[in-house]
């Protein structure tokens, strides 16, 4: 494959705010909501992103970010109080549809949508791709896990985001197309996956999704978070990613690291290849 045939663009998909204890546990801390954020020392920004891959075999999108109507959609679960989206992201910029438009695309132009997992800030725009053209996939364990949800939501899973969508299952560490693979990294949820892209010029990139929230989460040592379904599996997944990173010298792009946003080459700035 010629090096100019594989391009990766990182798309802005909304910035949430929250008590950072959700993402990095520290002794003696409680978790605040937005009505009490002034009492906390670490109320911060939680950026989200999607990854657009231009490949000879088609256009691939990794994750979808937060929806424009987050306030109403998240209200029943209470997540609107704990993870409010920044006001600036309620404008025309900063959401998936506008980020796609910046590069001249719309949802129907995507051939394959890969959902790292089905939480509200990753699958929140999945219905944009219910268009008869885009194939949607997620990990089999994730698809089986959400079948256990009683009621409309469980933690960060909102059934309204994905219920009724045709989502095909993939399993384990899987090469999607040459140079693009998903890594099975459960723990955060039943079937959380990470994305590995091997680029001729810019090297290997690993997009961890929520398998690793932050640089401090990665360590070493790895530091846990409040939103983890299975702590042992989570730790095993972090160490699995560390082994891959050491073997490939990959750049790690973490799921919600605000300090990394200035280092990422966003789609409006260019692409990786």
From Swiss-Prot:
Zn(2+) 1 binds at residues 117, 119, 188, 210. Pfam families: Lactamase_B. Zn(2+) 2 binds at residues 121-122, 210, 256. It catalyses: an N-acyl-L-homoserine lactone + H2O = an N-acyl-L-homoserine + H(+). Gene3D superfamilies: Ribonuclease Z/Hydroxyacylglutathione hydrolase-like. Binds 2 Zn(2+) ions per subunit. Its cofactor is Zn(2+). CDD domains: AHL_lactonase_MBL-fold (cd07729). GO terms for molecular function: acyl-L-homoserine-lactone lactonohydrolase activity; metal ion binding. SMART domains: Lactamase_B. Its EC number is 3.1.1.81. It comes from the Bacteria. Keywords: Hydrolase, Metal-binding, Zinc. The keyword Metal-binding applies. Disulfide bonds: none annotated. Hydrolyzes the acyl homoserine lactones N-hexanoyl-L-homoserine lactone, N-3-oxohexanoyl-L-homoserine lactone, N-octonoyl-L-homoserine lactone, N-decanoyl-L-homoserine lactone and N-3-oxododecanoyl-L-homoserine lactone. Belongs to the metallo-beta-lactamase superfamily. This is N-acyl homoserine lactonase. It comes from Arthrobacter sp.
